[in-house]
């Protein structure tokens, strides 16, 4: 999910100087019991010793013939419908990419105290790794089967979200079920100049075209541990430099991130990488600009933007001197554009989230009161979109929803767009700043 830069920072003059491709195969190791029977026939005409030897020989032969039957290895279905805990019955979910700390923090890798602190976070890591593996399996299915020219955005979004719900084992139709595990951020399908926060509302008929550049941004959570990750799809190779620039910029941000690293240093490195690329369309070259008012961000439990003490990770130089700290979780995301490199609110809103720790506000509309109660019980502070309300059987809720927004109880996140005619791209990963190593929890073979 994109975090916006404060307006005063966005206005800075920046022109002077940017696991696993397939579902893991798991053998359950189950074995069938030997069914061999001891059938040694006695021969009255033979002596006892000879008969015994013959029986023993027959037993050995039968034992050799009786082989253990192997159960078929379990793999994820297509579409993904097998809960991840079935594929990983011992909850031994795959690690993300493990990166050792460098320079002044290199001691953390072998420091016994730091390793002990890390081992204390076992439940935290298990929940994050489960969410990350679900994200990998669903997104790789989406890339192969859902995201194609001619597909509707609604079909793509619902295909992704259905996969996430099945793999978590929580369909979210019962009160509170979505809070156990499920969608951590609604599926954003942002086309061309639209950079973030666009998801199809009910009745949307938009069809993906061959010449489109689409950002796919969604989150998965287990017990509020949100994995926020995004990628960009383009079918025309003319857009490859744009995708490469943004992917490399994100990887630069991940490489630079670490304990005690200043946000300003990360932003400068990201911008330098991204803006070393350009895109040529029909003989015209377009410099690729970092979108200066979009940022990465901390992630808190059940809070996509890390709560009141959340931090932002700029993608341009000139940011503040705030440092990253041990134990924090970050979404490192970058956006590149062939336009102005600045986004504004545009189009119909689909994304919303309850404001954490909002003050008590008297609500006069009964529709707003009822809707707020439903949001609390089903989403808490997790972001949601209008389709999720439709799915829960809500009708004619817009008046109440707008009242909650105007009352300061719910935040609306309109789509964020650069100028029309431009193209934008996004790549994003979630990283954990563990005491002894940095883990890129959402890393996969795809990006």
Curated annotation (Swiss-Prot):
<dbReference type="InterPro" id="IPR036390">
    <property type="entry name" value="WH_DNA-bd_sf"/>
</dbReference>
<feature type="binding site">
    <location>
        <position position="428"/>
    </location>
    <ligand>
        <name>a divalent metal cation 1</name>
    </ligand>
</feature>
<dbReference type="InterPro" id="IPR000994">
    <property type="entry name" value="Pept_M24"/>
</dbReference>
<dbReference type="InterPro" id="IPR002468">
    <property type="entry name" value="Pept_M24A_MAP2"/>
</dbReference>
<dbReference type="GO" id="GO:0005737">
    <property type="term" value="C:cytoplasm"/>
</dbReference>
<comment type="similarity">
    <text>Belongs to the peptidase M24A family. Methionine aminopeptidase eukaryotic type 2 subfamily.</text>
</comment>
<dbReference type="GO" id="GO:0070006">
    <property type="term" value="F:metalloaminopeptidase activity"/>
</dbReference>
<feature type="region of interest" description="Disordered">
    <location>
        <begin position="1"/>
        <end position="89"/>
    </location>
</feature>
<feature type="binding site">
    <location>
        <position position="428"/>
    </location>
    <ligand>
        <name>a divalent metal cation 2</name>
    </ligand>
</feature>
<keyword id="KW-0031">Aminopeptidase</keyword>
<comment type="function">
    <text>Cotranslationally removes the N-terminal methionine from nascent proteins. The N-terminal methionine is often cleaved when the second residue in the primary sequence is small and uncharged (Met-Ala-, Cys, Gly, Pro, Ser, Thr, or Val).</text>
</comment>
<feature type="binding site">
    <location>
        <position position="217"/>
    </location>
    <ligand>
        <name>a divalent metal cation 1</name>
    </ligand>
</feature>
<dbReference type="GO" id="GO:0046872">
    <property type="term" value="F:metal ion binding"/>
</dbReference>
<feature type="binding site">
    <location>
        <position position="228"/>
    </location>
    <ligand>
        <name>a divalent metal cation 1</name>
    </ligand>
</feature>
<feature type="binding site">
    <location>
        <position position="305"/>
    </location>
    <ligand>
        <name>substrate</name>
    </ligand>
</feature>
<feature type="compositionally biased region" description="Polar residues">
    <location>
        <begin position="15"/>
        <end position="30"/>
    </location>
</feature>
<keyword id="KW-0963">Cytoplasm</keyword>
<dbReference type="InterPro" id="IPR050247">
    <property type="entry name" value="Met_Aminopeptidase_Type2"/>
</dbReference>
<dbReference type="InterPro" id="IPR018349">
    <property type="entry name" value="Pept_M24A_MAP2_BS"/>
</dbReference>
<keyword id="KW-0479">Metal-binding</keyword>
<dbReference type="InterPro" id="IPR036388">
    <property type="entry name" value="WH-like_DNA-bd_sf"/>
</dbReference>
<feature type="compositionally biased region" description="Basic residues">
    <location>
        <begin position="59"/>
        <end position="73"/>
    </location>
</feature>
<dbReference type="GO" id="GO:0004239">
    <property type="term" value="F:initiator methionyl aminopeptidase activity"/>
</dbReference>
<feature type="binding site">
    <location>
        <position position="333"/>
    </location>
    <ligand>
        <name>a divalent metal cation 2</name>
    </ligand>
</feature>
<protein>
    <recommendedName>
        <fullName>Methionine aminopeptidase 2-2</fullName>
        <ecNumber>3.4.11.18</ecNumber>
    </recommendedName>
</protein>
<feature type="binding site">
    <location>
        <position position="197"/>
    </location>
    <ligand>
        <name>substrate</name>
    </ligand>
</feature>
<feature type="binding site">
    <location>
        <position position="297"/>
    </location>
    <ligand>
        <name>a divalent metal cation 2</name>
    </ligand>
</feature>
<feature type="compositionally biased region" description="Acidic residues">
    <location>
        <begin position="34"/>
        <end position="47"/>
    </location>
</feature>
<dbReference type="GO" id="GO:0006508">
    <property type="term" value="P:proteolysis"/>
</dbReference>
<keyword id="KW-0378">Hydrolase</keyword>
<keyword id="KW-0645">Protease</keyword>
<feature type="binding site">
    <location>
        <position position="228"/>
    </location>
    <ligand>
        <name>a divalent metal cation 2</name>
    </ligand>
</feature>
<dbReference type="InterPro" id="IPR036005">
    <property type="entry name" value="Creatinase/aminopeptidase-like"/>
</dbReference>
<dbReference type="Pfam" id="PF00557">
    <property type="entry name" value="Peptidase_M24"/>
</dbReference>
<dbReference type="InterPro" id="IPR001714">
    <property type="entry name" value="Pept_M24_MAP"/>
</dbReference>
